[in-house]
């Protein structure tokens, strides 16, 4: 059950994300090719230290008992979130290199940082829709001897939210799903009239589908 402080932080995060234009209503196409009436652009959080720290705190609180020894943010948006968590909670971090250019394939380093094979690494991401980026990151980490069991995300866009990912069965925990984000936006009470109408329509559709 969510405590008062978590509920307050969730409300603050939704309010600021909407105010800075990170939450948008209307037709949008996701990187996965899926069409959505609700778009969340987490790239904007890097320009708002307040919302960055709030989102990072909420993500970290999904796992109050930490038993992984490393963090890795999915390139690129989640790198700032993972860094924020690493600094605040003193958890070592590794970096997955997404592009390898002008390097000898035999010397290509996919994961930067200090680590020992066999260590468990917790993956951090801003959101998950298809799960492809989390799986790719997990594969790179595992190829370097690290163990990946879990990913923490701010928003799980999947219809079957919080279901395990990939053949590894990576557990996914999220601050919001689309239905809970819509409810939080409506509860926020300061949506424009047009956005409120769309939010209510999305809420009705989600209730029918459930």
Swiss-Prot record:
One Gene Ontology term of the biological-process aspect is: pyrimidine nucleobase biosynthetic process
The GO terms this record gives for MF are: magnesium ion binding; orotate phosphoribosyltransferase activity; orotidine-5'-phosphate decarboxylase activity
Q: InterPro entries given for it?
A: OPRT (IPR023031), PRibTrfase_dom (IPR000836), PRTase-like (IPR029057)
Q: What are the EC numbers?
A: 2.4.2.10
Q: In which pathway does it act?
A: Pyrimidine metabolism; UMP biosynthesis via de novo pathway; UMP from orotate: step 1/2
Q: Which EC class does it fall in?
A: transferase
Q: Which cofactor does it need?
A: Mg(2+)
- Record keywords: Glycosyltransferase, Magnesium, Pyrimidine biosynthesis, Transferase
Catalysed reactions, as listed in the record: orotidine 5'-phosphate + diphosphate = orotate + 5-phospho-alpha-D-ribose 1-diphosphate
Q: Please list the residues that bind 5-phospho-alpha-D-ribose 1-diphosphate.
A: 97-98, 125-133
List residues traversing the bilayer.
Answer: none
Q: Where does orotate bind?
A: 129, 157
Keyword Hydrolase among UniProt keywords: no
Family to which this protein belongs: Belongs to the purine/pyrimidine phosphoribosyltransferase family. PyrE subfamily.
What HAMAP family does the annotation carry?
Answer: PyrE
Its job: Catalyzes the transfer of a ribosyl phosphate group from 5-phosphoribose 1-diphosphate to orotate, leading to the formation of orotidine monophosphate (OMP).
Subunit text: Homodimer.
Q: Please report the name of this protein according to its UniProt entry.
A: Orotate phosphoribosyltransferase
Give the organism the record lists: Chlamydia pneumoniae
């Amino acid at each position: 059950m969510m405590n008062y402080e978590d509920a307050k932080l969730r409300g603050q995060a939704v309010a600021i994300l909407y105010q800075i234009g990170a939450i948008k209503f209307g037709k949008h196409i996701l990187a996965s090719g899926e069409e959505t009436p609700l778009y969340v652009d987490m790239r904007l959080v890097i320009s708002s230290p307040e919302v960055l720290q709030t989102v990072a705190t909420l993500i970290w609180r999904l796992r109050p008992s930490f038993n992984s020894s490393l963090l890795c943010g999915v390139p690129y948006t989640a790198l700032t979130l993972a860094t924020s968590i690493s600094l605040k909670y003193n958890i070592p971090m590794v970096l997955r290199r997404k592009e390898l250019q002008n390097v000898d394939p035999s010397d290509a380093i996919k994961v930067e940082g200090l680590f020992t094979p066999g260590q468990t690494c917790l993956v951090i991401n801003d959101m998950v829709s298809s799960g492809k980026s989390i799986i790719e990151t997990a594969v790179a980490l595992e190829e370097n001897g690290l163990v990946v069991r879990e990913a923490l995300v701010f928003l799980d866009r999947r219809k079957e939210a919080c279901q395990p990912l990939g053949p590894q069965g990576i557990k996914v925990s999220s601050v919001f799903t689309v239905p809970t984000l819509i409810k939080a936006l409506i509860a926020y009470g300061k949506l424009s009239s047009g956005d409120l109408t769309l939010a209510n329509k999305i809420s009705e559709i989600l209730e029918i589908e459930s």
